[in-house]
Amino acid sequence: MRKKTSSNKKKQTKKTNNISLRRKLRLIYKKAILGLKIALIIFVCLFVFTKYFAGIKTYLTTNIYQTTTKLGFKLENVIIEGQQNVDEPTILKVLNANKGSPIFALKLDEIRNNLKKNKWIKEVYVSRRLPNTVYIKLFEREPIAIWQINNQLFLVDEEGYEISKNIQPFPHLLHVVGEGANIYAGKLVLELQKYPALMNKTSAAIRLGDRRWDLNLKGNISIKLPEKEFEEALKYVDALNKANKLFNQNYKALDLRDKNKYYIEKY
């Protein structure tokens, strides 16, 4: 009986030792895997974010580009959409790549950021259409007025952004003059567009005290608009024009600043 008990104890001890050994091996294995992961992360960080292995990176990158180019992944076409005032050579110059260049070598974010430096471009999207095409979608700023300030002329958009000094292609745009005129031109033009006949006879809009507008109409007629709610005043002037009671009355100025009482001055 004692011999059996002694034998059982030995078996249990051996089993316990085996379990302990397996646990140690698993622990060593886990630590080894963790160490390899940490080493791999460090290597990748050094490879990507530092100048270490710069020669290897260049060699590998060059070989990847050469291999993919042979497989047909090279620049053959550039599709441009939304282009109106930005000329094509300007866009292609920003690509900084020739036909046949590795398409994966193109830095799309850099191309996008450089294109956005052009004042005409409000937003732009650049993408690859594999295997051989780059697609560029432009959203250009739309000029709505010519702003005169400090004896200089600028094309401005509805947000008042200065687009260009080249106003020659846009002689039809309304001239707005004065401090802050560029900022508020968008709302004024939007209202005037409701009355095309009046819009066509408006030669300039003067911003006064950064508070209100004076309109200069053809025929040397000045329209003094109120500081607030000038929409009703424009509606009144348009009604006069449609009734043929504006340009043949020898008017010099219409003072519409007080909505309760309008004043008319004749020559």
Swiss-Prot record:
Compartments where found = Cell inner membrane
Ranges per topology, Cytoplasmic: 1-32
* Pfam families with a match to the protein in the record: FtsQ_DivIB_C, POTRA_1
Q: Where does it primarily localize? A: membrane
Start and end of every POTRA domain?
73-141
Q: Name one GO cellular component term.
A: plasma membrane
Which protein is depicted?
Cell division protein FtsQ
From what organism does this protein derive? Rickettsia felis (strain ATCC VR-1525 / URRWXCal2) (Rickettsia azadi)
